[in-house]
Amino acid sequence: MKINLNFVKHESFGGVLLIIATILALLFQNGFLNHFYTEILRAEFTVGFRDFNLSKPLILWVNDGLMAIFFFVVGLELKREILQGELSKPSQIALPTIGALGGVILPAVIFWAFNHGNDFAIRGWAIPTATDIAFALGVLMLLGKRIPSSLKIFLLTLAIIDDLCAIVIIAIFYTTKLSFISFVIAGICLFALWVLNKFKVSKKSAYILVTLILWVSVLKSGVHATIAGVVAAFFIPMRDDSGKSLLVELEHDLQGITSYFILPVFAFVNAGVSLAGVQINQLLNSVGMGIFFGLLIGKQVGVFLFSYIFIKLGFAKLPEGSSWTQFYGVCILTGIGFTMSLFVNSLAYHDSNEFFHADKLGILLASFTAGVIGYIYLLVFSKVAKNHRKDNES
């Protein structure tokens, strides 16, 4: 099996940019540039002409617009992997699918245990179920050849399925009032995309135009606009009659943009948590605790436990060349929720300050802790495993 090295390069370096963007957001929000930072996020931008225009603050252009492009890339990746990649065979997809399922269920249960008595707080149950593929892969790539490529493939595949779960959750649970007219327009756009796909049209401009109309209609429909990106991606043809792959071409063109620009910008506008006057009792509220323990404990235990049972029942095997200790280390890294958790958080609470930023702080602290612990754990046990192999060879 071969891992997509170009994707990993984009995602791992993107992780470094995410860290820088997060630090800058915290410095801006808690320094002398606080007012400037807040005004930037609230600044209204209008796109369109005459009566046909959209006006939104910058933060919503990022969350609804740029993130739709990110999910479009996720959709392209999913389609390619399903047709000819790591998700094309049941034997390849079984273990990461079961692991991803455990990584959604247990964090949600932990969050529910902390917040089941609060109707508003419980809206955030999906926050600790997400994994940030850029950060998780970035940490894993820092370990280089100490980690078998099969484990990198496992984490990459699990993260892809995790993204798919997030898409389904957003579509079902974070939808507002629905607009029938907007749904009709969206349906027409989907039919147009189907026709383009059926005749294997390879002009990017045709897909871009229809997808833009689809995005606006979905935005107005009440369903979150990022869903438009995923759905549109599945209509991009894998190959035309000449053998050219528009899907691979678009994925290649947009990977760098999403990893080096969109996700860092998203982190910058969403990770600016004010620490002024923050007290320990605020950090220990039910939402902050549910998110923190859901990500840090729920993700790693859920992924490992479901995978362990599945393997012991004989339905799957450990990734080739890996040990149980290394496998558990990768499970720890799934607790890095960061950008995906922040995104779900923005949908659940609409950037409310109801919890004194304990929600965002819980995400940042849990993601940072999972990354550090996972890296140190894998560094130690990978060296132990390597030395053990050398001793056996001698």
Swiss-Prot record:
Gene3D superfamilies: Na+/H+ antiporter like domain
Any Gene Ontology biological process: regulation of pH
Keyword Transmembrane helix annotated: yes
Membrane topology recorded in Swiss-Prot or TrEMBL: Multi-pass membrane protein
Substrates-to-products reaction catalysed: Na(+)(in) + 2 H(+)(out) = Na(+)(out) + 2 H(+)(in)
GO terms assigned for molecular function: sodium:proton antiporter activity
One Pfam family recorded for the sequence: Na_H_antiport_1
Transmembrane portions of the chain: 13-33, 58-78, 93-113, 124-144, 153-173, 176-196, 208-228, 260-280, 291-311, 327-347, 361-381
Name of protein: Na(+)/H(+) antiporter NhaA 2
Organism: Campylobacter fetus subsp. fetus (strain 82-40)
